[in-house]
């Protein structure tokens, strides 16, 4: 089986090297995101980054879910990124 595949690849490379290279690049483009550590860390950063940022509001003391200052740390932190 491996002999047939290698013979096919040698023949294809001899006749159409552009197609062989293009299919190889396509295969790497499909496989690399699954095995890349960049994908793992990018998804961790996206989970920790808020989608909506706090709007400055006048706090009357009855809003426990609104931070007193927009830069107050709330939610998941990115300390793991600093410790890489």
UniProtKB/Swiss-Prot annotation:
Gene Ontology annotations of biological process type: aerobic respiration; proton motive force-driven mitochondrial ATP synthesis
Primary location: mitochondrion
Any single GO CC term annotated in Swiss-Prot or TrEMBL for this entry: mitochondrion
Membrane-spanning intervals of the chain: 19-39
Segments for region (Disordered): 59-84
Compartment annotation: Mitochondrion inner membrane
Modified residues (N-acetylalanine): 2
Topology versus the membrane: Single-pass membrane protein
Keywords recorded for this protein, A-Z: Acetylation, Electron transport, Membrane, Mitochondrion, Mitochondrion inner membrane, Respiratory chain, Transmembrane, Transmembrane helix, Transport
Assembly and oligomerization: Complex I is composed of 45 different subunits.
Role summary: Accessory subunit of the mitochondrial membrane respiratory chain NADH dehydrogenase (Complex I), that is believed not to be involved in catalysis. Complex I functions in the transfer of electrons from NADH to the respiratory chain. The immediate electron acceptor for the enzyme is believed to be ubiquinone.
Family: Belongs to the complex I NDUFA3 subunit family.
Protein name: NADH dehydrogenase [ubiquinone] 1 alpha subcomplex subunit 3
Taxonomic lineage from the root: Eukaryota, Metazoa, Chordata, Craniata, Vertebrata
């Amino acid at each position: 089986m491996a002999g047939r595949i290698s013979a096919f690849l040698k023949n294809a490379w001899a006749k159409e090297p552009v197609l062989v290279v293009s299919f190889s690049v396509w295969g790497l483009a499909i496989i690399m995101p699954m095995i890349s550590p960049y994908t793992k860390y990018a998804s961790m950063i996206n989970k920790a980054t808020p989608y909506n940022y706090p709007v400055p509001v006048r706090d009357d003391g009855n809003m426990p879910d609104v931070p007193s200052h927009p830069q107050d740390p709330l939610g998941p932190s990115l300390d793991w990124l600093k410790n890489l």
